[in-house]
C-alpha cells in the first residue's frame, strides 16, 4: 500500500471514529417504541438505553430507586371518558400529563381548560398525529409541533409545556434531535397495554393483569383516554398503586 493511501485510510478511520463519538444517541435508529419485560415488578428494557435517550433530552423511565409513578394519557379524540378520568384524578389528588393532538383541542376546548385548571400538564402529540419519522426537513417537523402550540395558546391563553410524545411511538434519532433543538423533551413510556382499540376493549380483569404485576419504580405509564376500561378501572387502579407504596410525580420531576 502506498504512503498516500495509508495516510488516507488513517484519516478516514479517524474521521469515522470522531463522528460516532460526537453524535449523541448514535445507536438510536428509526423504529417503533417497544418494551421487553425481564421480570415482574422491574423496569423493562427499551429499544434505546436511558443514556442514549438522555443525550437527546428524551426518556422512558424515571428514577428506579424511588417508588414514583408518572401517569400519562394520550388523547387522539374524545370518546366520552375524559371527564370521568379527570374526576378520579381530582378525587385522588393525582397529577397526570395529557398528550393532545390538534383535533382534540379544537373539539374539546372545555376539557383542555379543565386539565389546565386542575393542575395537569398538557404535552405535544403533534397537530395531525402523523408518522413523524418520515419528516426529515426540520421546518416541516417543527410545524407539526408549533401549530399545536398556537392552537393551545388560543384556547387556554397559556404556553404549551415542552414535552413531546411521538405519534404511535414511531421515532428516529433525527426526530429526537429536531425536537431537542426546539427545546422539547421527548417522553416514551415503560408500561402500557392494548387499551386503544375501542372496538375490542379489555376486561377489567385483563387490564389489571397486564398493569399491576408490571408496575415498577419510576414507571412512565401510558394509558389512552379513549378507553372505557381505563375510565372504569382508574379509581381502583390508583387505590391499588397507592396501597403498594407508590406516589405520583410530574414530568418536571422526571426531567429535573
PLM-predicted stretches and their roles:
Residues 216-252:
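Catalytic grooves of carbohydrate-active enzymes
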Residues 10-11, 132, 172, 231:
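Enrichment for repetitive, rod-forming helical segments
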Residues 67-69, 79-81, 90-222, 226:
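Metal-dependent polysaccharide deacetylase catalytic core of the NodB/CE4 family, i.e.
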Residues 1-2, 163:
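Intrinsically disordered, low-complexity sequence elements enriched in Ser/Thr/Gly/Pro
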Residues 2-72, 78-87, 91, 206, ...:
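N-terminal pre-catalytic segment of deacetylase/amide-hydrolase enzymes
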Amino acid at each position: 500500500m502506498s504512503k498516500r493511501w495509508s495516510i488516507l485510510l488513517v484519516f478516514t478511520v479517524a474521521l469515522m471514529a470522531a463522528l460516532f463519538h460526537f453524535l449523541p444517541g448514535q445507536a438510536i435508529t428509526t423504529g417503533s417504541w417497544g418494551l421487553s419485560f425481564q421480570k415482574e415488578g422491574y423496569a423493562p428494557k427499551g429499544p434505546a438505553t436511558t443514556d442514549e435517550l438522555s443525550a437527546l433530552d428524551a426518556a422512558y423511565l424515571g428514577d428506579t430507586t424511588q417508588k414514583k409513578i408518572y401517569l400519562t394519557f394520550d388523547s387522539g379524540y374524545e370518546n366520552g371518558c375524559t371527564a370521568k378520568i379527570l374526576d378520579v384524578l381530582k378525587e385522588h389528588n393525582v397529577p397526570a400529563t395529557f398528550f393532545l393532538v390538534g383535533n382534540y383541542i379544537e373539539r374539546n376546548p372545555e376539557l383542555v381548560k379543565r386539565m389546565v385548571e386542575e393542575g395537569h400538564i398538557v404535552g405535544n402529540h403533534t397537530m395531525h398525529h402523523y408518522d413523524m419519522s418520515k419528516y426529515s426537513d426540520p421546518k416541516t417537523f417543527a410545524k407539526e409541533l408549533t401549530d399545536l402550540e398556537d392552537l393551545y395558546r388560543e384556547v387556554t391563553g397559556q404556553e404549551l409545556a415542552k414535552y413531546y410524545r411521538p405519534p404511535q411511538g414511531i421515532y428516529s434519532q433525527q426526530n429526537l434531535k429536531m425536537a431537542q433543538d426546539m427545546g422539547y423533551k421527548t417522553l416514551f413510556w415503560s408500561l402500557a397495554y392494548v387499551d386503544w382499540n375501542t372496538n375490542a376493549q379489555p376486561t377489567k380483569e385483563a387490564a389489571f393483569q397486564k398493569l399491576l404485576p408490571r408496575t415498577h419504580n419510576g414507571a412512565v405509564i401510558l394509558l389512552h383516554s379513549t378507553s372505557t376500561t381505563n375510565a372504569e378501572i382508574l379509581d381502583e387502579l390508583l387505590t391499588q398503586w397507592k396501597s403498594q407504596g407508590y406516589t405520583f410525580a410530574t414530568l418536571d420531576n422526571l426531567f429535573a
